[in-house]
Amino acid sequence: RYRKLGKHKASGLYYPTLHTLCVDIRSPSSFIHEYFHMIDDQLGDLSLEVSFNPITVLYKESFLRQMEQLSDAVKSTLNGKSKYNIQYFFRRAEIFARCGEIYFSRILKVESSLIKPDLAYAYPESEALDEAVKTYFEMLLTVRLPNYGLPEAV
C-alpha cells in the first residue's frame, strides 16, 4: 500500500500480523527495505536461521569498525536511548532488511526510487560482508523463493 505515513515518522512500515507493506507515497525509497522485512517474516524468520549468522557477525563488526569515524552527535544517538540506537540497528530483522538493500544497491547496482539507503553508516562497507551478502541473497532469491512456490525475485 502506498499512503502518507506522517504520524508514524517512517517512510515505510511492514505489519506482520496484517501481511501488509506500507510505503509513504512521498518517499518510496524504503520499499526494498520493507520488502525484505516481508520476505523475512513470510518465509519463517529467515534472519533467525543459522545460515544468516555469518552475515550478522560481519555486519556488526563492520558497523562497529566504521562507527569510530562517525561524528560525536551520531555516536551519541547510537549509544543513547532513542529508538534508533545501536540495539535497533543490530536487530537481526533490521540487519536482514539492510543487507537485502545492500544486495540490490551494491551487488546488483540497482538504481531506483524504490531503493535509496538514507543513513550511510547503517550500510557498512566491507568486502567480506558484500561477498557474504551476495552468496546468501543470490541463493535466497533464485533458489529458495521458487521452492516456496514464489517466482524468482531477480
Tell what function each PLM region has.
Residues 1-154:
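Active-site-flanking segments in enzyme catalytic domains
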